[in-house]
Amino acid sequence: MYSNIELFTMIAIIVLLTKPLGTYMYNIFEYKPMRSDKIFLPVENFIYKITGINPEEEMDWKKYALTFLLVNMVMMIITYFILRVQQFLPLNPTGAKNMESSLAFNTVISFMTNTNLQHYAGEDGITFLSQMIVIVFLMFTSAASGLVTAAAIMRGLSKKTTNLGNFYADFVRITVRLLLPISMLATLILVWQGVPQTFAGKVVVDTLEGGKQTIITGPVAVLESIKHLGTNGGGFFGANSSHPFENPTWLTNMIEMLLMMLLPTSLIYTYGLMINNKKHALVLYISLFVIFILLAVGAVYAENHPGVAYSKLHIYGKPYGNYEGKEVRFGVSQSPLFATVTTAFTTGSVDSMHDSYTPLGGAVPLILMMLNTIFGGDGAGLQNIIMYTILTVFLTGLMVGRTPEYLGRKIETKEIKLIALAILVHPFLILFSSALTVMLKVGASSVTNPLYHGLTQVLYEFSSAAANNGSEFAGFIGNTVFMNIMTGLVMFFGRYITIILMLAVAGSMAEKIPAPPSPGTFRTDNAIFGAIFIAVVLIVGALTFFPAVILGPISEFLSMT
């Protein structure tokens, strides 16, 4: 009962914030005059001046995509070398060593792609300086990269020009006007609730037993805010948001979930304003929340009713649920709700150990990452939603014998080939990598559980990497050379191939002259379209991943009953 109240309270707050924040992002993307210009314009102009950026330069989709890639590659190279020499740099109170080459490769790709898959423990694997100028820096820039490429795609679908904007100007504006202000406010709230923000490093305390204990602190709050606002997910500590210094109270737990949901939901309203069709955006908004609520309720129910196998242990049962791997302060209801939010919005932070969930409870976050469309992360999620929207319109047009049109522009062979390729990249990366891992001894050695749960561990690892989520079944051994390279490549291709293909779709659609709606135009702003959209998302996901899910969590569930 409590979890349902929390779920719908959280959704109500997000719904109230969607319109004002969505409008604000629209004004940022469209360069509208704002009252805050007197604060932000001088900062932006200073950045343009010292970097030599010309914010008036126009870019077509090819130049926008190339600039996006080059900027991201440069940031990855610089941060890679910082991690490789971090022990020789200042602000290293914990004595962290230089990061091993394959782990550094995995880490910089992980954070630059907004995945934040962590094969290291933050307490001793990385310095305070690296936390700030590598981890936090990439958390801001990866979120900004996703948001501005989404803005470029929205312009391509809504404008009568092939100019998709200026990557540099978009990047600066979204960072200065959106990510930094909200992160600063969230940081202050988290500090108020007890999250550390200090350079003190180690604190040695006397325990009740008379011994000594070393407690690691650090600049945690500033990381924690952008970690969730930017749908990043990487933790300052190895235990992530289950650690009391990252997530000390039920209020911080709620705030972190709200931060994860804030930008992806509001971006759908921004999309409605950009295409001048708020009803269409509302249909997408409701459709996605329908799927999200059903899966959230399912996850909470599965963890509260763990089944016969748990009841026989005489420590679990209907009154208590599955407490294994969960923090007592969050319990068996808040934990799966957090797991649903973190995988639906591709953040990847965890306040409980997903590897300890029941088979069906663990299947929910796995399915959300496989679908990779239920809101998703900052910017990248909207791109996937648009991808499935165009596919839905195309399939519907084929069924009724009409030429498919979206926003007045015909969907032709070129666009649908690009869309099909973008959709296929995600399952190919997951299934091929999972199959290769279980076939090779060097990969199978990372699996720590037999039979069905072991396969689920592998599927979860690569689903998380391909979806740019970053959460893990923590029992899986990720920090090996093979897994660092494999997941690094999956994260890289899962991020950049899809974004570039969607920019190409936007560029192709921008070249077409939009036609006014006719009586034969399939409407995308009613309940019929919403139902078909849900069906397409679920059917495509089911057909692609159903055999693997059957062999993993569903078989494990059946074996326990």
Swiss-Prot record:
Domain of life: Bacteria
Keyword Transmembrane helix: yes
GO cellular component, one term: plasma membrane
Pfam families: KdpA
Subcellular localization: Cell membrane
Membrane topology field: Multi-pass membrane protein
One Gene Ontology molecular-function label: P-type potassium transmembrane transporter activity
TM region positions: 5-25, 63-83, 103-122, 133-153, 179-199, 255-275, 281-301, 380-400, 418-438, 485-505, 531-551
Keywords assigned: Cell membrane, Ion transport, Membrane, Potassium, Potassium transport, Transmembrane, Transmembrane helix, Transport
Main localisation: membrane
Protein family per UniProt: Belongs to the KdpA family.
Subunit comment: The system is composed of three essential subunits: KdpA, KdpB and KdpC.
Protein purpose: Part of the high-affinity ATP-driven potassium transport (or Kdp) system, which catalyzes the hydrolysis of ATP coupled with the electrogenic transport of potassium into the cytoplasm. This subunit binds the extracellular potassium ions and delivers the ions to the membrane domain of KdpB through an intramembrane tunnel.
The protein, known as: Potassium-transporting ATPase potassium-binding subunit
Source species: Caldanaerobacter subterraneus subsp. tengcongensis (strain DSM 15242 / JCM 11007 / NBRC 100824 / MB4)
Lineage: Bacteria, Bacillati, Bacillota, Clostridia, Thermoanaerobacterales
Gene designation per UniProt: kdpA
